[in-house]
Amino acid sequence: MSLSRRQFLAVGSAAAAAGLTGCGSRSSLGGKNELSMWTWVGSVNDDLIGQAEKAIPGHDGMKLSMTRIGSNYKTKVLTALAGKSLVPDIVAINDDVATYFPNADQFHDLNELGAKDLSKDFLAWKWKLGITPDDKMMAYPMDTGPTALFYRTDIFQKAGIDIDPAAVADLAPDWDTYIALAKKVKQAVPGSSITDNITSIFSYRMAQAPKRYMTEDGQYIGDQDHVREAFDLAVRVVKEGLSANAQNGSTDADAVVTNGRLVAFNAAVWWAQLGPKNAAPKTKGLWRVTAAPGGAGNRGGSFLAITKYCKNPEAAFAFISWLESSKNQAQAFLDPVLFPSTPASYTDPRLSAPDPFFGGQKIVDVFAESAKKYPGAYFSPYDSIVGTPLSNELVNVETAGKSPDQAWSDAQRQIGRELTRVGAI
């Protein structure tokens, strides 16, 4: 099951031609002295945007006009590109950046605007994710989502476990030792869980892997051992009684944090805010963070791209490179808690301060190590086509008692049908 680089580009060009033809003339949003930008809530620092709305740094004759799109963000971006009219100059793109690669001809190659000279300032794996199969720099790095192990010190103490972050990391360097540790915690504090649901274990294990579902030359590898290992690990955690069975989107999702059932969680840096700080503020001081079992990982992170309809590409690049400088990424970590893709930010005093919610621990140090050690992995335009059936079948295992082997087989059959339908295999 393979698709060559040349075939991929041919398919991408055909998709772009078929999906992005429109009767409108090419035009971008906003006045001639404005750069229009689309993004979503919580993706940028408001103070920095406020500065650019007065004047683009280095381009005093230009200013930013930003729109926060609510629901269906990606659909609205693709619809605007398809119409080739009233297209924003700059768009934010989520971690599914590879799904935009077939439409790369609708975006500027940022290397032609000077991006290549700045690559040394960024995490190499993050930089690579914005590069298309034909080596065009389509998307500029924003934040990342390095992973680590969150845990409740009060619960671990009841199980007689040394709560020092370094000690916990030594006790659970891999998933086998971590599960053994979790069983000890559950024995001391019945009802304790180390995941909200089965799919989180699968997703975060895959987030540690150096390869995912497709190779760069288009070969399907989502049925290989590394994926099955993550699948089986998720099943094992459930079978050991260590999942809270709080499915995504359910009312129980936050409740397991609030009521204290979720006593440890291998998660991305952004979970600190979405999880304990929001759902369990009374647990302030009880949480710590340490290196995750199984190694460094990453889940999440965004990008900025400049559309071909941009009225002033040079000013647009000056803006995005300023916005995502190490100094400004450090500011964006404070609000809205976006973890930088620029390693120089990690030693910024604004990031390295102790966090009272985590008992005064400097948690940025833990996530910085994860971000730097993460091996990186290739994300294909078809990752969601592969990942969704696998996750759905895992839910069937946890909620309906489906046989794991049958769930795996059914997922692979559906994946094969869907990849065939879209011409990927």
Q: Over which residues does each language-model region extend?
A:
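Short helix-initiation/N-cap motifs at beta->coil->alpha
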Residues: 67-76, 96, 171-177, 245-259
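Hinge/lid segment of periplasmic solute-binding proteins
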Residues: 95-148, 286-288, 356, 369
